[in-house]
Regions:
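Mature extracytoplasmic/periplasmic domains
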Residues: 271-338
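Paired acidic/hydrophobic, glycine-rich loop segments that form the ligand-binding mouth/hinge
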Residues: 76-83, 217-218, 234-239, 255
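Conserved C-terminal helix/tail region of periplasmic/extracytoplasmic solute-binding proteins
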Residues: 333-367
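A bilobed periplasmic-binding-protein/Venus flytrap-type ligand-binding module shared by bacterial periplasmic
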Residues: 138-145, 181-183, 265-279, 295-298
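Extracytoplasmic ligand-binding site segments that recognize negatively charged/polar headgroups
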Residues: 32-39, 84-229
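Early extracytoplasmic/lumenal segment of secretory-pathway proteins
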Residues: 23-91
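A ligand-binding cleft/hinge motif common to bilobed small-molecule-binding domains
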Residues: 88-91, 235-253
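Periplasmic-binding protein-like
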Residues: 201-211, 248-274
Length: 367
């Protein structure tokens, strides 16, 4: 009798462990093609999901730390994993909004591997955030609009006499000021030093005067593609992933100006007090493997933050899911990184508010 009870209790414990070992949890990201690439790249490929042991509910948000902070401070945490920008990774960890990850224990040489990304960035910006992708602000144009000499450098974007026509520019100053300095002759590797030094922002705004009267502003990621397609502008700043998807999946006729692209990144973190913290951390280990980062690139042209992911793509080209080569559309190849500006999220977090008035005045003068 007691033996049967013992066996029954062990069975109940085993079932309970099985039920909780891979609990369902929530993954929060930005939506659209990017979230789809995450779904196919490392959500659907995670062992517990493939085996039917867990389900991952995907939700979208508009970024920032507001909702994360509200959940943590209320003690009612509903989100588990969140895709975040660098400044939110840094600030969120400092404010105790994300779980420390102890990434050094994930796999042998992990920290060294994520630092080996070719950007000069140390790889780890926070003990609470794991590496995801590099994306970039880049210039695109329709080559049919320039039957003769084509624009190839950032200074061409600012030269409305040599390359006449409207330019698409987003409604916030990040990346625009960096691009202006590149167009003004600053080497991409020196842009942050100049921008952050005495008179740096004034120099950038002075260069922006070259575009006066030739700007169409956009605020949503799909808009600049439509502006170029329709001929409303001849060139535009865009997110490279949007442009890559339009070219590779839709056959759009765009070309890039890679010089002076402004490189940024996305990271993934576990919310402090997440209801399924252990499962979430195990998921992050899978999502940030070399193989998972390469798999995501089959569906979007953002670059793996780990170089080993990029190496897998190089060996497997043509890599995009429809059989087209993806590397010509990625921002973090060795050649392109030499001509890139790596954004400084901490500086922007500290100075964005003070630049807002000057930026708003510049935008108003370009209507």
């Amino acid at each position: 009798m007691f033996k049967l009870i013992k066996v029954a209790l062990l069975a109940i414990v085993a079932l309970a462990f099985t039920a909780t070992a891979y609990a369902d949890f929530t993954f929060v990201s930005w939506g659209g093609a990017y979230t789809m690439s995450q779904q196919k790249g490392y959500i659907d490929t995670w062992g517990p999901v493939k085996a039917g042991k867990t389900k991952i509910a995907v939700e979208n948000y508009n970024g920032g730390l507001g909702e994360v902070k509200a959940q943590v401070e209320s003690g009612n945490v509903k989100w588990d994993v969140v895709d975040i920008l660098p400044v939110d990774a840094i600030n969120g960890c400092d404010e105790g909004l994300f779980e420390p990850l102890n990434m050094a224990s994930w796999e042998k040489g992990y920290l060294k591997s994520i630092a080996d990304n070719g950007t000069g960035n140390p790889g780890t910006i926070s003990e609470c955030a794991a590496p995801q992708i590099w994306w970039t602000y880049v210039i695109i144009y329709d080559p049919k609009k320039f039957p003769g000499k084509k624009p190839t450098r950032m200074k061409d974007f600012f030269d409305v006499k040599k390359f006449p026509g409207k330019r698409g520019v987003h409604t916030w100053p990040q990346a625009v000021l960096e691009m202006a300095l590149v167009a003004d002759g600053v080497k991409p590797s020196k842009v942050n030093k100049v921008l952050q030094g005495e008179g740096g922002t004034d120099r950038a705004f002075a260069k922006l005067e070259d575009l006066k009267g030739h700007v169409v502003h956009w605020s949503a990621g799909a808009q600049p593609l439509e502006l170029v397609k329709s001929g409303s502008v001849v060139m535009s700043i865009v997110y490279n992933g949007r442009a890559g998807a339009a070219i590779l999946s839709e056959g759009a006729s765009f070309d890039y100006i890679w010089e002076g692209q402004v490189l940024d990144g996305d990271w993934i973190a576990v919310v402090k007090g997440a209801p399924n913290k252990d499962e979430a951390i195990e998921f992050l280990k899978h999502a940030t493997t070399c193989e998972s980062q390469a798999e995501q690139a089959k569906y979007i042209t953002y670059g793996p933050m780990r170089k080993c992911g990029l190496d897998i793509i190089k060996k497997g080209e043509p890599w995009f899911h429809n059989g087209i080569a993806v590397l010509p559309h990625m921002p973090n190849t060795k050649k392109r990184l030499k001509k890139s500006v790596l954004t400084d999220p901490v500086w922007w977090a500290d100075h964005n508010a003070e630049l807002k008035e000057q930026w708003s005045a510049w935008m108003a003068g370009n209507k």
